[in-house]
From Swiss-Prot:
ATP binds at residues 29-36, 55, 145. It holds the Pfam family tRNA_Me_trans_C. It is an enzyme of class 2 (transferase). It is found in: Cytoplasm. InterPro entries: MnmA-like, MnmA-like_C, MnmA-like_central, MnmA-like_central_sf, Rossmann-like_a/b/a_fold. The active site is at residues 120, 217. One of its GO terms (cellular component) is cytoplasm. This is tRNA-specific 2-thiouridylase MnmA. Catalyzes the 2-thiolation of uridine at the wobble position (U34) of tRNA, leading to the formation of s(2)U34. GO terms for biological process: tRNA wobble position uridine thiolation. Keywords: ATP-binding, Cytoplasm, Disulfide bond, Nucleotide-binding, RNA-binding, Transferase, tRNA processing, tRNA-binding. The record marks 146, 362 as: Interaction with tRNA. Belongs to the MnmA/TRMU family.
Length: 383
């Protein structure tokens, strides 16, 4: 198969490089989406022996509108048939439940806001999948449709941001070690999303115009509140201002996150301005949601954070203060900061400028230029 867009936009490999690649087997994770579809095609063009693997990581239930595994599998199979490659199938639902979902529930129960996509990458895509591909399928590499890049210079493997800054997914992959990165290929990380779609359209792939998934990893885009209530009992309570004034009722602390503005159910409050309210604290002991009014309210701001559960890509803990940038949530602009090691698994991060909505349970991910250094889980804010 040929793609005019691919021929024009992507660098051509030499015949020697293609011959070298032809001795390597790559198992490409096929999600039924456009990114993994085009990744498999690019790997073929680069000469690799390519096979696909579809992972089922969530058991179907009665949420037929949200669990799209059957449709995704059909799309993945159609793409593999079109490309002429074999598609393997594996069920990691038990691993997902034990290593991702139970942690997800425990964090919400503890009043934190976890990022299950990060844990899914750590425990499923780059652990269970990688081990299965190498040990059972004889892979030399795995490949995924993530928008990140890998750098190999002087024997040093590094994880870099994706070329398309609008789609960069390095934030979700900071737990990977340099060895895991070295065993992984990220074909679409070197190109921009519009080109990925154009290649898919060129090839007539069924996934060319398929909408990107934006739901929780492997759970889909169901109504989150209803979904969470099936696993954790809600405990309604009071909404109070920072000064203690009661201004409403909340549905359960687990449904709210720091910095949240929408969905608080607070209308106009007598004697107060029309400025919006923001969540600034979740008081678990008293089951109180604390809010502040105005987007420039000092209660929203943090001077820094404490992060634990650290993962550095090179797996070498820092021993001295580090100047770098940090993201405390996906799609955030880089924040200039200083990282101060407290021990091998805990750092203090001091921002150059105060930041809003620093949320315990989310991840702080560190960068130097294009390189993703690693990160950790936000334990608490520093006010």
């Amino acid at each position: 198969m040929k793609s005019i867009v691919y021929e024009k936009k992507l660098p051509k490999l030499t015949s020697l490089e293609i011959a070298k690649n032809s001795k390597k087997k790559v198992i490409c994770g096929m999600s039924g989406g456009v990114d993994s579809s085009v990744s498999a095609f690019i790997l073929q063009q680069q000469g690799y022996q390519v096979e696909g693997l579809f992972m089922k990581n969530w058991e179907e239930d009665d949420d037929t509108d949200y669990c799209t595994a059957a449709n995704d599998l059909a799309d993945a199979q159609a793409v593999c048939d079109k490309l002429g490659i074999k598609l393997h199938k594996i069920n990691f639902a038990a691993e997902y439940w034990d290593n991702v979902f139970e942690h997800f529930l425990a964090e919400y129960k503890a009043g934190r806001t976890p990022n299950p996509d990060i844990l899914c990458n750590k425990e499923i895509k780059f652990k269970a999948f990688l081990e299965y591909a190498v040990e059972d399928l004889g892979a030399d590499y795995i490949a995924t449709g993530h928008y990140v890049r890998r750098s190999d210079v002087n024997g040093q493997t590094k994880l870099l941001r994706g070329l398309d800054s609008n789609k960069d997914q390095s934030y979700f992959l900071y737990t990977l070690s340099k060895d895991q990165v070295a065993q992984s290929l990220f074909p679409v990380g070197e190109i921009e999303k519009p080109i990925v779609r154009a290649i898919a359209e060129d090839l007539g792939l069924i996934t060319a115009k398929k909408k990107d998934s934006t739901g929780i990893c492997f759970i889909g885009e169901r109504k989150f509140k209803e979904f969470l209530a099936r696993f954790l009992p809600a405990q309604p309570g009071e909404i109070r201002m920072v000064d203690g004034k009661v201004i409403g009722k909340h549905d359960g602390l687990m449904y709210y996150t720091l910095g949240q503005r929408k969905g608080l159910g607070i209308g106009g409050v007598k004697g107060l301005s029309e400025d919006p309210f923001y969540v600034v604290e979740k008081d678990l002991i008293n089951n109180v949601l604390v809010v502040a009014q105005g987007n420039d309210n000092s209660a929203l701001l943090s001077q820094g954070l404490i992060a634990t559960q650290l993962y550095w890509v090179d797996r070498l803990p820092i021993r001295q203060n580090l100047r770098c940038t940090v993201k405390t949530r996906y799609r955030q602009q880089d924040i200039a900061c200083e990282v101060i090691p407290l021990n091998d698994d805990c750092v203090e991060v001091r921002f150059d400028e105060p930041q809003i909505a620093v949320t315990p349970g989310q991840s702080a991910v560190f960068y130097q230029g294009e390189e993703c250094l690693g990160g950790g889980v936000i334990e608490r804010q520093i006010k």
